[in-house]
Amino acid sequence: MKRFSFFLAPVSNVVPHKTVGIEQIYNVIRGDYYRAATEELRSLIQGEGVTQRDVQRFKARNFDYATFSGEFSRRREDALLAHSGLLCLDFDHISRWQGGGHLQGVYGLRYALAHDASVDTALLFRSPGGDGLKW
């Protein structure tokens, strides 16, 4: 099983909480664990006078995170203990993405990535803000 480091919020925490696998992350994302923070973030984004910096600060304080590329002793490039064989691509602000079909935005890109036969997809999910994807 491919394993990688999982860190508890805030993002300033550079020591991993534990080592996890794709199935554990999938279960956390699909469950209710981040629902309240996600809803609060999406409300914040819709608010007047909210800056990108406000949004980034909220995410940094309220969401745990993972280093899908491998296991680390600390969150630093030179602290890699074992590579997972995974690579995570982060697509931000894709509400205007248009593919070849009728689907557009996050849902269109998600469909295109999920059906790309040239890449093995381990996990594909919407980012907490709602207008991005993690692949």
Where in the sequence are the language-model features?
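Signature for HUH/AEP ssDNA processing cores
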Residues: 1-131
